[in-house]
Amino acid sequence: SVVKYQKKKYKIEDFALESIWQNDLKYEEYEKLNNFFWFFSLDLKSSKRTTQTVIDNWINKNHRYNKKSWDFDITSKRIISWLSNHQLTYEDCEEKFKKKFDQSIQKQTNHLLYEIKNLSEVENKIVGCAAIILTGLSYKEENKYLANGLTLLKKIIKSSIDNQGFPQSRNIKQLIF
């Protein structure tokens, strides 16, 4: 599943935030840190300002394309996490941060739109479509994201499901998502 439910909630203040982006991590840990899915484990009573500072620091460090941190799957999940946790990431933020956040989301979504055609894994394409569609729903004035995301999702469904509604692939990874 895209998001795993956890009962235990953490306060963002419990993490070592000053050194969070400077650690030399194994790829799996790096992926978990940079896709921000750990935000789903945060208590909604966590500091919004601290959460926004973590994002601001990430944007400052990764505003230019970097193959590792802009990996398609990582970027898709990061967009989903940032937008789904808007109570912590976006509410009550300063105008300067809001503008920077919006630009980063749009830049990352444009990257997904450009890269999705190069992917072969159906699961990653669907997660990418979810991120693009979520961006379109979150930024209604940018209706190109919603329209493009839905068009891509239709193409994925047409190419992976036959006329009777059965999966065309026998690949077990593509049958379970």
Regions found by a protein language model. Give the residues of each.
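N-terminal transition regions in large eukaryotic proteins
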Residues: S1-F37
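Aromatic-lined, polymer-binding surfaces characteristic
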Residues: Y27-F177
